[in-house]
């Protein structure tokens, strides 16, 4: 057979000098052997349909395989290198042919897949540009940032001033506030011949509604009578609380009235001194001086026993206040 003849042939490769004729002979012999092998395989497939032919081929293939293995063991490394080089050349030529085919396809015209790829690429570029613009705008908005909440606010000088002007702040006005015209300064000053002598609106209202003090005193006396007649302890406690609240209000009102009288008396005295030419500038009383003057006037109006009780009570009150303000170590020591 041709395959056995080609395999049994002894080939000796020259190391120093490569002969192209031997290389061509080797490649042709290998091609012939491969063709023969393919023909033999096709014959074996065709003969596989018959049972007797298969048995004969199987019996004859066993010694042939052993002969092929023995002949392959005797092939030199130079022949194997030349065969490998020939296979590499054939693969490179096939790659070149494939590249030429692709180039010719491109020269023929653009395919629909290329159009789709181009559209996808364009949409991606547009999306990247839009995201970049949004990030830059966000960065610009975040530029005036304070280091802490106590730091002053930073604002660009290019900020345009609004043309609108807030005349009335709607947020400050929670709702329409009720106004009583009886206590309005305009109403109280209207119809009087000398508003300056009358004083402010509060003084005028106190003068016009002074009868309320009489009503308050009458109500306090009636509550004291009810407390004397009451027998229920809960009712007594409620009446005591009401009487205490009313007496505190009356005492506060009287104290404010005394302070106003002291201030008015001092202003009249200072005005008279300036009119007489004894003083050039008036002297205004401080709040502490006004309280001292009111306390002095109150002690003068009291009796001896009441004055002594009030002084003792005031001393205890001041001592308790000083004890509360004193540190714990000094308080216990």
Swiss-Prot record:
Residues 84-95 have a biased composition (Low complexity). Residues 1-70, 84-189, 303-333 are annotated as: Disordered. Residues 102-129, 319-333 have a biased composition (Basic and acidic residues). GO terms for biological process: maturation of SSU-rRNA from tricistronic rRNA transcript (SSU-rRNA, 5.8S rRNA, LSU-rRNA). Residues 32-43 have a biased composition (Acidic residues). Its main location: nucleus. Keywords: Coiled coil, Nucleus, Ribonucleoprotein, Ribosome biogenesis, rRNA processing. InterPro entries: RRP36 (IPR009292). It comes from the Eukaryota. Residues 218-259 form a coiled coil. One of its GO terms (cellular component) is 90S preribosome. It is found in: Nucleus, Nucleolus. Pfam families: RRP36. Belongs to the RRP36 family. Component of the 90S pre-ribosome involved in the maturation of rRNAs. Required for early cleavages of the pre-RNAs in the 40S ribosomal subunit maturation pathway. Associates with 90S and pre-40S pre-ribosomal particles. This is rRNA biogenesis protein RRP36.
